[in-house]
Amino acid sequence: MIKYFSGDYDVIVIGGGHAGCEAALAASRMGCRTLMCTMNLDSIAMMPCNPNIGGTAKGHLVKEIDALGGEMGVNIDKTFIQSRMLNISKGPAVHSLRAQADKVRYSEVMRNVLENQEDLYLRQIEVISLDIEDGKVKGIVTKNGACFTANTIVLATGTYLRSRIIIGEVNYSGGPSGLFPANELSQSLIDVGIKLRRFKTGTPARINKRSVDFSKMVEQPGDERIIPFSFLNDKLEKEQISCYLTYTNEKTHEVIKENIDRSPLYNGTIKSVGPRYCPSIEDKVMRFPDKQQHQIFIEPEGENTNDLYVGGMSSSLPEEVQIKMLKTVPGLEDVEILKTAYAIEYDCIDPTQLKLSLEFKDVKGLFGAGQFNGSSGYEEAASQGIIAGINAALMVKNKEPLILGRSDGYIGVLIDDLVTKGTNEPYRMMTSRAEYRLLLRQDNADLRLTELGHKIGLVDENRYEKFIGRKNAIEEELNRLKKVQITNKKEVNDFLEGLGSVSLKKPISLYELIRRPELDYDKLQTLDIDRKDLAQDIIDEVNIMIKYEGYIEKQLEQVDQFKKFEKRVIPEDIDYNSIKNLRTEAIQKLSKLRPVNLGQASRISGVSPSDISVLMIYLDYYFKNK
């Protein structure tokens, strides 16, 4: 192959999925000349699995991406076909927004944004190797011989590296949704010392809407009030498309059990690790034999298509078994398959090879993002993509990287978990992973992160002005409510008793009254004669901040303690073998992972509290005598 020089860039992003899109947009919006290389320009921001954005904990990630100046929230607001707020029966910390996407339009609109972004250049081309010299990024080589130079590279290769499609006894080299795999780049990564491993994921069949009997299913319409993902949008209105719920049964399970020896998961064909929280239908049936039924969600993939996604029925069983299995489900008796379910195996890295900035520890200027890092999900990928893109741009500008901590956002939790703890399976974000989830609500993502996004140059003035307006409105309303006094007049007490609340014995502020469990901002509207006409999102924020004030203050105290550990920096050149009384396992783990501070060290599996105490004493001595 004859190679030729084809251009010089500040940042090169390899991959055009959800991680690659956010990385490329972040870097270019921060003023860096950026090249995005993708196998197929028509598959940008493709949704090869579920046709939705958000969901439990994932909705938090999308809100945080948006607050930093990312695109995912803006894009789904333009292309959704149904919107629902999940977990509304629980507290606000776990409320999570989820939207069904028109997956074709989602991809088209995102591509249009990329094509019109200043300083961003797109190429449909396969990258086959990296040019690394003396542990530093120099550029890339493509299959056609084109060579591009760059100061930084973001690897966002998704599930394409040496990917294999598995359907029963059928097993072949291929990427998701019928696309080509990337079979050559992996060896280049191995050659520069990057450790790879194999993960697997899967997707359900797609079926023809015309072959489904919806009368045998439970309709799931969207919410009446549509809450936007992006803080740029005050409200959205749209005629929504329903999803449907049905269930497997004993007949379904019998088909699976009769053919379990043909399942690649159970006959040894698939040896790689799959996502724990998204098991295949055969896995669910075999692992939970006492369960008589499993939920199946029938989800539309767009407005102008008959494609339906069969959620909850991911499988790698042979095609004829899949058809037989589907036809046992109520409403699917005459089902026609459009696309067969499959499992896909692919190369990814052990993310403990990365710094918290998502730069590789041993290759300067090389960043990883998305499923390449061992995560699962569009939202997790996009979250890493925006941080990798930001930090690639900051490196080009010779500035310090942006590190989000566990108390800053779900993105911080996600990255810290991957980099510090590693993962033995595709990592999925969950609210239970966040220690400070009452502080990290999706409704306050802008209050936590937009100032930061503006400071680094990613949040533009239009978004920043909108943020300042919202922030000021919330603060002004909180201050006003503290000043409004409600007297203990008879009509007031009668009103309160009618709401099931205790009558007043002396005047009290409206702020204090809202704190009562049985009352809220809207219920007390009658008593608030000077109430302003505020947007619903501001009302919701004010209500939450008042009602959960005590709990929020306690978590802020916990964060203060946590940050004391995070501020105790560990020198890069520390020799753990020279520290007396440190256990052998701790020496090995700390030497391998090289934590940057005591907080990160304390979260490493195999490092005990006594090891941290020894390390603290050593650091005191080290800095005292330096």
Swiss-Prot record:
This is tRNA uridine 5-carboxymethylaminomethyl modification enzyme MnmG. Keywords: Cytoplasm, FAD, Flavoprotein, NAD, tRNA processing. Transmembrane segments: none annotated. It holds the Pfam family GIDA_C_1st. It comes from Clostridium acetobutylicum (strain ATCC 824 / DSM 792 / JCM 1419 / IAM 19013 / LMG 5710 / NBRC 13948 / NRRL B-527 / VKM B-1787 / 2291 / W). Its main location: cytoplasm. It is found in: Cytoplasm. The gene is mnmG. NAD-binding protein involved in the addition of a carboxymethylaminomethyl (cmnm) group at the wobble position (U34) of certain tRNAs, forming tRNA-cmnm(5)s(2)U34.
